[in-house]
Amino acid sequence: MIISPKIKSENDNFKIFEAVKIAFTKLNSNIKNTKGRPRKYSDEQIVACMLYGVKHSIFSLRELEYEIKKDYVFQTIINLNQIPDYSTFSLRAKTLEKHIYYGIYAMFIELIAPETRLCAIDATALRSSKYDSEAKSGKGTRLGYYRGYKLHCIVTVTDTIIPLVFDLTTANVYDNQVPDLLYEAKIYNPFLILADAAYDSVEWFEIAEKLEFNLLTDINMRKAKSIEAFIDKRYENALFFESPIGVNLYKNRLKIEQLFSVL
């Protein structure tokens, strides 16, 4: 199928595929294998297909295969001579997720250049299919007891709400069991990260101090009758949280909940 240059330039899929190719060129990730048969589909083509699914709200790989088979313009744009089946999408997507997706995402954040001085961290429940053998049971604020996964992320909350770093765990992992996110967020140079009471932990305050940024959390009283029973960093946090400045700053944490509400 031949498509005129004008139609190509006005097609969203063409623009997306061009952006994907630029990203891969910068990452220099699509190195040809010297062993075995050459791949039938390039990494750029697989990523373009996955983005096609996102753009068209396609949540099943079988449906993705079916819809792409009908879209001859898209096939021509990304130079597909044959459509990958759903199992190929699954295998290739898992490989790309480990080695490439995060690099591309970090590149897009760099291009957007959001204000990162004020951020927030939280987690949200993601219910799974009852046939998912890898899912675990846990308790979430929104769903109560459920079976599935949990998305943990740190987002900017100043003007544009953009996830900076994230992790997906099973539902049985507590919110404060992913301290690695703090280390990953360091490259964005945050000044203050806001969090709910689940993160009111000496370990988290010590990590934040080591990384040279601040952590402000809601107060987790546990069995204490007052904040006077707290020691060290937890006491300092409680005082700041109850101060007028702390109250004002903490209001921005609601923005991460707004983000989760649309997931």
Please annotate each region the language model reported.
Residues 61-77:
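DNA-recognition alpha helix
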Residues 45, 67-69, 85:
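Non-catalytic DNA-binding core/recognition domains of DNA-processing enzymes
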Residues 197-262:
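Helix-centered, glycine/charged polyanion-binding patches within enzymatic domains
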Residues 77-96:
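Major-groove recognition helix of helix-turn-helix-like DNA-binding domains
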